[in-house]
Amino acid sequence: FLLLKILLIICVMFLIFSFVYGIARTNDISMKPAIKDSDLVLYYRLDKNFVSGDVVVFKKNNRIMMSRVVAVAGDQVDITKDGLMINGAVQISQDIYSDTTQFKDGTDFPLTVGQGQVFVLGDNRTVASDSRIYGCLNINDIKGKAIAVIRTRGI
């Protein structure tokens, strides 16, 4: 009877982590300092209503990546000498320590985020691979919204 309970718990946990939640490990420093290299991120798969500030987990070029949503459908995004502008307003964040600049062979600005898309940037703007390179993300390509970070340094 105990074995049956254990098997049931394992099956329930498998279903929960297959369809409701997911865990991803970071492999870069694009989201530093919020998420550091080798941290584990618990994400929620079912919420597809993203807002500016959400950290999302997605797959791009066969790599699991994480970035912060900075613009949603209908928003106009521009990167100028003044920095990141959303709908004509300069965006300033206490958690971003470097300037937001365009990449030479990246996305053309200004752009308007399309329906069913979001524009994402890594917090570590100087090294992040984000929408400045590959454009807006389709919401269907996003695995989920980060809800917790588990630090693994020293483990």
Residue ranges of each PLM-predicted region?
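Short, conserved secondary-structure segments in the cores of folded domains
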Residues: S30-M31, L46, S67, K81, ...
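PP2C/PPM family metal-dependent serine/threonine protein phosphatase catalytic domain
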Residues: N87-D105
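Extracytoplasmic/periplasmic/luminal assembly and interaction segments
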Residues: K48-I86, Q91
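Protein maturation boundaries and topogenic segments
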Residues: F1-M65, L137-I155
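Beta-strand-rich cores of mature extracytoplasmic or soluble domains
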Residues: D105-I155
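Structural motif
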Residues: S38-D39, D54, D75, Q117, ...
